[in-house]
Curated annotation (Swiss-Prot):
Ranges for domain Helicase C-terminal: 235-455
Native species: Candida albicans (strain SC5314 / ATCC MYA-2876)
Biased composition (Basic residues): 549-564
Motif (DEAD box): 170-173
Protein name per the record: ATP-dependent RNA helicase DBP9
Length: 574
C-alpha cells in the first residue's frame, strides 16, 4: 500500500468527482495528493458503491489496492445513518500491514473523525484498554485473523458482529499461506454472511486457494484481474552474482563502504542470527544499519519502518522467515517434474517438513509493507522459493520508480567450505535460481548475471578477514540479547513518554553499534591505496616529512636566548 501511485497506473480519463463521493472524503483525498484514481480504483470503486458487488481483485504492488477498498468503506459509513455498531472489518496477514492500513484510513478520516472511529486490534493494547475501546463499538476494526478470533472467543458476549456490512481480506494469498484459513472459517459463524455482507478479497496474485473463501463469503463477485506487470518491467533491473560463502560478506562490505548503490537498500537474510552476523560485520567498518526481525517488539518494528521511510536509515537488514512457507510447494512442483523425467523410476515418499521458527507469527516484511523509495533489494541470502523472490523484489521499483534487485547465489561446489559463513538453505541456491529465472522469463523479465571485478575487490579481503573473525557465535548471541533488551525498554517503558513528547521520538535510533567482542577502530577508514583510481581523492603535497625529528636543529634554535632572570644558584644566601 502506497500513498501515491505511478502515472503508469493512473486512469487519466476518470476523476474522483465522477464517483459521487462524500465532500469530506474528497477533501481528504485531495490532501493526500491523489490527482486521479488508478486503474484498479476506477474499476473497483463504482462496482462497490453503485452496484454493491462483492469484489475479488488482482493488481500489482503499488497500484493502489488499499485505497480501492478503503474509499468505498469510508464513503458508505459517512452516508450511513443507521445505529452505532461495528460496520466494517479489515483483515490483513501481518501486524505491520495492519498498522499501515490503520494510518491510511486515519488520513481518509481527517475531516470526519467525529463520525467514524477506527480500532487497530494488532496494536499492543492491554486487555483492559482493549475491552474499553471495544465497548465504544468502533465502526471499523483492523486486525489479523488470529487476533480477531482470539478477542471474539474471550469477549463473545460483549462484541456484536451482526451489524457488520463489509468484510475485507487484504493480501489474501499471504493470509492463506500463513495458515489463517481455520480462523477465517471460525469467523463465518460470527458474521451475517447470508445477509447483505459485502466482501472484498484483494491480492497481487489470485489462485485456486481462493475458491473456499469465495464460496463462504462472496455472492456473484466481480473478478478484476488487471495486467499491470508490464508497467514495472522497464523500471526493475535484476541481477545475480555467483559467489563463495565468505565473499558474500566481502562484497557487501565493498558495496556499502564505497557507496556503490545510491539510495536506500533492503538486505534480506534467511534467519535472525544471519542478520546480526551481517550487522556486526558491517558496523566494524563504520557502516550504520538497522535490523528488522520477528523477535523485536511490534512498536519497535513499526518505528523502524517509519524511520526508514523518512530516510533516517539507508540500510535495513530484514529477516525474511516467511520465504520458507513456500519452499515445500516449490519442492513439490520440482518433484513432479523429476517424476515425469524419470518415467517409471521409483519415487520415495517425501517427509513432511516441520516449521522451525518460533518467532511472531504475525511478522512479515517481504510482502505488503510500504517501504518507500527503495533503490535496491539485496538478496544477501537467496530465498528458498521463486514466490518468495517475487515478494522480496516487490519492495523496490514501486509506483513506477526505478529499482534494482541483486541476488548472491552460492554454487553447489562452494557449499560448506567456510563453516562460519555457511547457511544450510544455500545448498539449493542454484536449483532455486533456475526456478526463479524460469518464472521471471514467463512474466517477460530477465535476470542478468553480474560480474564483480575481483581484482579490485581483492585488496579489501584482509580487512574483511579481520572483521569477520571478530564476529563469533558468542558475539552474535550477545548482540541479539542486547538488541532485544534495548528494544524492549524503548518499546514498553518509554511508550507513554513518547506519546506525550513526540518530538523526542526522533532521537530514538535503531542503528546503534552493538559492538562485537573485539573492536577494531582502524577498519572504519579505507586507505587511499585500496580505492580504485576513480574514487581516490587528490592529496595535497605537504613536502618532505623526515622519519625522525631533527633534535640538533631544535637545540640550536633555542641557543642565544638569555637565561632566566632569577638564577637560584646565584641568589642563594647563607
Amino acid at each position: 500500500m502506497s500513498t501515491s501511485a505511478s502515472s503508469s497506473y493512473l486512469d487519466d480519463e476518470t476523476t474522483w468527482d465522477s464517483f459521487n463521493l462524500d465532500p469530506r472524503l474528497l477533501q481528504a483525498i485531495d490532501q493526500l495528493g491523489f490527482s486521479n484514481p488508478t486503474l484498479i480504483q476506477s474499476s473497483a470503486i463504482p462496482l462497490a458503491l453503485e452496484e454493491k458487488r462483492d469484489i475479488i481483485a488482482k493488481a500489482s504492488t503499488g497500484s493502489g489496492k488499499t485505497a480501492a477498498y478503503c474509499i468505498p468503506i469510508v464513503n458508505n459509513l459517512l452516508t450511513d445513518d443507521s445505529s452505532q455498531g461495528i460496520k466494517s472489518i479489515i483483515l490483513v496477514p501481518t501486524r505491520e500491514l495492519s498498522n499501515q492500513v490503520f494510518q491510511f484510513v486515519e488520513k481518509l478520516l481527517t475531516f470526519s473523525t467525529n463520525k467514524i472511529n477506527v480500532l487497530n486490534l494488532s496494536s499492543s493494547y492491554s486487555d483492559q484498554v482493549l475491552n474499553s475501546l471495544l465497548v465504544n463499538k468502533p465502526e471499523i476494526i483492523i486486525s489479523t485473523p488470529a487476533k480477531l478470533i482470539q478477542i471474539l472467543e474471550k469477549n463473545e458476549k460483549n462484541i456484536d458482529l451482526s451489524t457488520v456490512k463489509n468484510l475485507t481480506i487484504d493480501e489474501v494469498d499471504l493470509v492463506l499461506s500463513f495458515g489463517y484459513l481455520d480462523d477465517l472459517k471460525k469467523l463465518e459463524s460470527y458474521l451475517p454472511v447470508k445477509k447483505n455482507l459485502q466482501t472484498f478479497l484483494m491480492s497481487a496474485t489470485v489462485n485456486d486457494d481462493l475458491d473456499d473463501l469465495k464460496q463462504r463469503y462472496c455472492t456473484k463477485p466481480a473478478i478484476l484481474k488487471l495486467n499491470e506487470d508490464s508497467a514495472n518491467q522497464n523500471n526493475l533491473v535484476q541481477y545475480y552474482a555467483k559467489t563463495t560463502e565468505f565473499d558474500k560478506f566481502l562484497l557487501a562490505y565493498v558495496i556499502f563502504k564505497l557507496n556503490l548503490i545510491k539510495g536506500k537498500t533492503i538486505a534480506f537474510v534467511n534467519n535472525i542470527d544471519r542478520g546480526y552476523r551481517l550487522k556486526l560485520f558491517l558496523e566494524q567498518f563504520g557502516i550504520r544499519c538497522c535490523i528488522l526481525n520477528s523477535e523485536l517488539p511490534i512498536n519497535s518494528r513499526l518505528h523502524i519502518v517509519e524511520e526508514f521511510n523518512k530516510n533516517v536509515y539507508h540500510l535495513l537488514i530484514a529477516t525474511d522467515e516467511t520465504n520458507e512457507l513456500n519452499e515445500e510447494q516449490d519442492d513439490d512442483e520440482d518433484g513432479d517434474e523429476d517424476t515425469k523425467d524419470k518415467g517409471n523410476a521409483e519415487t520415495k515418499p517425501k517427509k513432511s517438513k516441520k516449521s522451525k521458527f518460533k518467532q511472531d507469527k504475525e511478522y512479515g516484511v517481504s510482502r505488503g509493507v510500504d517501504f518507500r523509495n527503495v533503490a535496491c533489494v539485496l538478496n544477501f541470502d537467496l530465498p528458498t522459493s521463486s514466490k518468495a523472490y517475487i515478494h522480496r523484489i516487490g519492495r523496490t521499483a514501486r509506483a513506477g520508480k526505478a529499482g534494482m534487485a541483486l541476488s548472491f547465489v552460492l554454487p553447489l561446489s562452494e557449499f560448506g567450505k567456510h563453516k562460519t559463513a555457511s547457511l544450510a538453505s544455500a545448498k539449493k541456491d542454484e536449483k532455486v535460481l533456475g526456478r526463479i529465472v524460469k518464472q521471471q522469463s514467463k512474466n517477460g523479465f530477465e535476470i542478468k548475471p553480474y560480474q564483480f571485478d575481483m581484482k579490485q575487490v581483492e585488496g579489501f579481503r584482509y580487512r574483511a578477514d579481520d572483521a569477520f573473525r571478530a564476529v563469533t557465535q558468542t558475539a552474535v548471541r550477545e548482540a541479539r540479547v542486547k538488541e532485544l533488551k534495548n528494544e524492549l525498554i524503548n518499546s514498553e517503558k518509554l511508550k507513554r513518554f513518547f506519546e506525550e513528547n513526540p518530538q523526542d521520538l526522533a532521537s530514538l535510533r535503531h542503528d546503534k553499534e552493538l559492538h562485537p567482542a573485539r573492536i577494531q577502530s582502524q577498519l572504519k577508514n579505507v586507505p587511499q591505496y585500496l580505492l580504485p583510481e576513480s574514487a581516490r581523492q587528490d592529496v595535497k603535497n605537504i613536502g618532505f616529512v623526515p622519519f625522525h625529528k631533527n633534535k640538533i636543529h631544535k637545540h640550536r634554535k633555542g641557543k642565544g636566548k638569555g637565561r632566566k632572570k632569577v638564577d637560584p644558584l646565584k641568589s642563594f644566601r647563607k
